[in-house]
Amino acid sequence: MCQHGKGFPSPYCYVNEYQEVTRMAVTAAMVKELREMTGAGMMDCKKALAETDGDMDKAVEFLREKGLAGAAKKAGRIAAEGIVDTLVSEDGKTAVVVEVNSETDFVAKNEKFQTYVKEVAKQALKSDAADMDAFMAEKWNDDPSLTVAEELSSQIAIIGENMKIRRFNKVSEPNGFVASYIHAGGKIGVLVDVETDVVNDAVHEMAKNVAMQIAALKPAFTNEAEVSQEYIEHEKEILRAQIENDPKEASKPDKVKEGMIQGRIKKELKEVCLLDQVYVKAEDGKQSVQAYVESVAKANGAKITIKKFVRFETGEGLEKKNEDFAAEVAKQMGA
């Protein structure tokens, strides 16, 4: 019993105890409804309804609060799996590619996770955010009472695994269109900026083929004009060291060595620059991507320029956590 003053009962004590006794009973139908609304577990829903006196809205907030706390605990785990997705505007002139990471490939294949990634892509397509911090602080389109970051935390609580919106890139082309391509079920996503005065099926097919080229051969640049002098000098230093470490080449005159370096740089640029690469579908095995684009332009009476591209690969640059299942279970049980 609660006390007031010198051991006497508080005048409010009886009221509080009466309210505790008459708290609304939680029914199975209420638990079912809350589960459908939130995706939370049965016992969690039952507790939320009990704690909020059966108020459904407050119960949802209660679960969100608990979910956010759970998400904070999960945030220490590495999210290196996941999927990449793309979305193109109705007029075809703007497109976005996003990467959302999860901890396991199992969750990456989950329908709820995939649906959430598509919603992130919709958000990113409409976003004017200059960086990820600004994007995460934006209001969530489907529920402006939440930020993008808060909606992510809610999804983490529902799905039960740490997730991260790692990055997005939006490309716009007012004088043509942006093509998109997804490879291997979301492992790789590509956007291609195509400037053209003719837009038809043949030009769209060309853009898709170029996107597939990018996905397969992973170029670093669109053309040589994009290659920085720093990159070239760095590669020259590596080639120079290779020559000096080769007894057969180290003894050659400096002029010959420099000629060898220039030749190897030229060859490397053809491999890392998209338009200089050999087109993967070239019938003669020699046609460059640039030559392929020009052939399509000529056949359609068009002027076509591949201005730039974006290529995302799931988890690239991230460390993947290797931990066996037994160890994970032991950790969960506090062993």
Predicted regions, residues:
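Intrinsically disordered, low-complexity segments enriched in serine/proline and basic residues
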Residues: H4-Y12
